[in-house]
Structures are given as structure tokens and as C-alpha cells.
Swiss-Prot record:
Gene3D superfamilies: Divalent-metal-dependent TIM barrel enzymes (3.20.20.150). It catalyses: Endonucleolytic cleavage to 5'-phosphooligonucleotide end-products. Pfam families: AP_endonuc_2. Its cofactor is Zn(2+). The keyword Zinc applies. The lineage of its organism: Bacteria, Pseudomonadati, Pseudomonadota, Gammaproteobacteria, Enterobacterales. Zn(2+) 1 binds at residues 69, 109, 145. One of its GO terms (biological process) is base-excision repair. Its EC number is 3.1.21.2. Zn(2+) 2 binds at residues 145, 179, 216, 261. It comes from the Bacteria. Keywords: DNA damage, DNA repair, Endonuclease, Hydrolase, Metal-binding, Nuclease, Zinc. This is Probable endonuclease 4. Zn(2+) 3 binds at residues 182, 229, 231.
Length: 285
């Protein structure tokens, strides 16, 4: 079964996120468990935790259908020690918040070398940052998102994702989230079914489907291989509908959150309905 949804707002309280996901007839959702543009947040209260869990139960969302995202400020590969420690503390807090909420995944951008340290050193710092957080939490998997490779951001090549995983001690608690827009901008073609087959065969060989724990389904305003991160609505960008139809009809993408971060929330319900319909089309073929 495919879990299909979008990154919904938690404005007004975390319990509002599953309700908003239900409004667009989603079977998955992503959210921020705190303000993503601030370092600090008030601790979760027992009431907030209970309300969120009750809402998830009410709208039939299990932890496997929810892909929380951490703060954009965090850089787990930061070249400066003080800033690295600040990011590691913030990441641990994010992992602990997931743990408290009964969530089992935390999606994050790996990190940037800021042109100050070697790529290999940055990747090693990211892996060590994950190890530190995993050692102090239980039950939450660190889910590394591939990037478009904009600026000095790492994680845009499958080999970089594999290198981070290689440095993580507990392989059972590390995974990846593939963002289709990021992959396309990083030079992985998805414009035809044949291109999708080739790209994901490469992913399977270098990273491994056993590590795929979520996806972000986004079309791309950015050009192929441009290393520019610009999302678009499904079928309206440079990737086109074929990739998303192909994903919906491939069983390797079952049982993980497939999350829209497309640019027009007003049509998320339509995009989700279209994605669901592609599965039906395959079943009837």
C-alpha cells in the first residue's frame, strides 16, 4: 500500500497536523514538530503529546505514515566546532521530540561543508552527529534527505548518502528520503519510465532499497543537473507526470510516506487523488 500525503502545517498546535492531512484525503503527512526557523522551542507538554496521539488515532495515521522534518537551521556537518555542537544539540532535541510523540522517523538535510573542510570530513561529521543522537534516543530512525547540491550542501550524490550510512553504527536506525526534485536537479534523470528505471537501479546498487524510508514527490522548476532546488506542482515542471505514475506503480515504494512539497497547497487534494488513481490504473491493466 502507498502512503500518500503532503507536508501540512502544525500552526495552532501539533494536533492540527493530522486533521489537516485528513482534509486533503491523505494517507500520510509530514510536519515540523517545532518552529523550523528557530533554534529553541518550548518542551512538549504531556497535554500536547496526548492531543497529538489522539488526533493521529482519530484520523487513522500510524507512525509509519508520518515523516517529521527537522529545522532548516541544523548543519550536522558544520566545519566550526561550536556551531557543530549547537546543531547536534538541536538535532538531538528533534529526535527526542519524535520519541515523545511516538514517531519513528525524522527526515533531515545532511549538512554543508561551507567551503571550509573537505567533503569527506563533512560526511564523517554528519555520520558522527547521527551516532551521537541515536545513542541518546530509542525507536527513531534518522532519515537522510538527498539534496539538489545547491551551494556547499552534501547529499546530492547517492555515493554521499552511502558514505554517511557507512559511518553510522546502528544501520537499523538510519535511512534515506529521496526528493524527486532534488534528484533531478542533481543530475538523476526521471523524465521517462526508462530514466526512472536507470536512476533507481543506481540507487539500489549504491544505497540500497532497504534504506528507503520516505520520499518527497515534487516536480522541478529547476533544469536537469542545475544543482538548483526549485519545486513545482506535479506535471507542471521539467520532470513531468511519467515519473510519479511510475513510482505509484512500483511496489518498492509501498509502505513508506510519499510526501508532496509542491508549491500550491490549494491543489494538494487533487494531486493526492491523481497519485492514488495511478495505482488503480495499474491494478486494472
Amino acid at each position: 500500500m502507498k502512503y500518500i500525503g503532503a507536508h501540512v502545517s502544525a500552526a495552532g498546535g501539533l494536533a492540527n497536523a493530522p486533521a489537516r492531512a485528513a482534509e486533503i484525503v491523505a494517507t500520510a503527512f509530514a510536519l515540523f514538530t517545532k518552529n523550523q526557523r528557530q533554534w529553541r522551542a518550548a518542551p512538549l507538554t504531556p497535554q500536547v503529546i496526548d492531543d497529538f496521539k489522539i488526533a493521529c488515532e482519530k484520523y487513522h495515521f500510524s507512525a509509519a505514515q508520518i515523516l517529521p522534518h527537522d529545522s532548516y537551521l541544523i548543519n550536522l556537518g558544520h566545519p566550526v566546532s561550536e556551531a557543530l555542537e549547537k546543531s547536534r544539540d538541536a538535532f538531538l532535541d528533534e529526535m527526542q521530540r519524535c520519541e515523545q510523540l511516538g514517531l519513528t522517523l525524522l527526515n533531515f538535510h545532511p549538512g554543508s561543508h561551507l567551503m571550509q573542510i573537505a567533503q569527506e570530513d563533512c560526511l564523517a561529521r554528519i555520520a558522527e552527529s547521527i551516532n551521537i543522537a541515536l545513542a541518546q534516543t530509542e525507536g527513531v530512525t534518522a532519515v537522510i534527505e538527498n539534496t539538489a547540491g545547491q551551494g556547499s550542501n552534501l547529499g546530492f550524490e547517492f555515493e554521499q548518502l552511502a558514505a554517511i550510512i557507512d559511518g553510522v553504527e546502528d544501520k537499523s536506525r538510519v535511512g534515506v528520503c529521496i526528493d524527486t526534485c532534488h534528484a533531478f536537479a542533481a543530475g538523476y534523470d526521471l523524465r521517462t519510465p526508462e530514466a526512472c528505471e536507470k536512476t533507481f537501479a543506481e540507487f539500489g546498487k549504491i544505497v540500497g532499497f532497504q534504506y528507503l524510508r520516505g520520499m518527497h514527490l515534487n516536480d522541478a522548476k529547476s533544469a536537469f543537473g542545475s544543482r538548483v532546488d526549485r519545486h513545482h506542482s506535479l506535471g507542471e515542471g521539467n520532470i513531468g507526470h511519467d515519473a510519479f505514475r511510475w513510482i505509484m506503480q512500483d511496489g518498492r515504494f509501498d509502505g513508506i510516506p510519499l510526501i508532496l512539497e509542491t508549491i500550491n497547497p490549494d491543489i494538494w487534494a487533487e494531486e493526492i487523488a491523481w497519485l492514488k488513481a495511478q495505482q488503480i490504473a495499474e491494478a486494472m491493466a
